[in-house]
Amino acid sequence: MSETAPAETAAPAPVEKSPAKKKTTKKAGAAKRKATGPPVSELITKAVSASKERGGVSLPALKKALAAGGYDVEKNNSRIKLGLKSLVSKGTLVQTKGTGASGSFKLNKKAASGEAKPKAKKTGAAKAKKPAGATPKKPKKTAGAKKTVKKTPKKAKKPAAAGVKKVAKSPKKAKAAAKPKKAAKSPAKPKAVKSKASKPKVTKPKTAKPKAAKAKKAVSKKK
């Protein structure tokens, strides 16, 4: 009995480990299948854009181009047809000949130009974002400019004081300019001279009075 008991307990251990290994292998296989390359629609659009035929690319010519790129055409034949139909329905490809997947296909220039414009807009937005990141550096320069602005008022105060001294000195010049007023008053003196000159005219009759007195004395003596 003692020999059979350990055999029963040891048997379940490998049964529990085996399912975990199977799950990991399945996940790894699924990851490998997903990472096989770009989708069929991208390969078809590249092949059609590379062709220089004006009438468009036929289905057999498209398969040859895909096979040259290393794509397995025989296994993915149904995917190629579905990809062509979806691209025609979206408007990226235009079917010039035939119906369905059979026929010739060409790139839609309007759709291609519409896809190119959003890319240009994205690049413009990226360029606009770069200056936005560069702008915070400018405020640092302005901070330096503020320091220079603070220093300048000290220099400005000195010329202001010098200007005040000059203004204080200017009244002396004004006093010197005021002196000619005294010189202007001097012409009033000739008026006084004129008055003196007029006085002798008044004094002349006074000088005549003594003569009259002398005449009176002479008359009295004669009497």
UniProtKB/Swiss-Prot annotation:
Histone H1 protein binds to linker DNA between nucleosomes forming the macromolecular structure known as the chromatin fiber. Histones H1 are necessary for the condensation of nucleosome chains into higher-order structured fibers. Also acts as a regulator of individual gene transcription through chromatin remodeling, nucleosome spacing and DNA methylation. The modification N6-acetyllysine is found at K17, K46, K75, K165. Belongs to the histone H1/H5 family. Residues 20-35, 119-130, 137-158, 166-184, 191-223 have a biased composition (Basic residues). The modification Phosphoserine is found at S2, S18, S170, S186. It comes from Mus musculus. Its main location: nucleus. The C-terminal domain is required for high-affinity binding to chromatin. The modification Citrulline is found at R54. This is Histone H1.5. The modification N6-(beta-hydroxybutyryl)lysine is found at K34, K52, K64, K85, K90, K106. Keywords: Acetylation, Chromosome, Citrullination, DNA-binding, Hydroxylation, Methylation, Nucleus, Phosphoprotein. Residues 36-109 form the H15 domain.
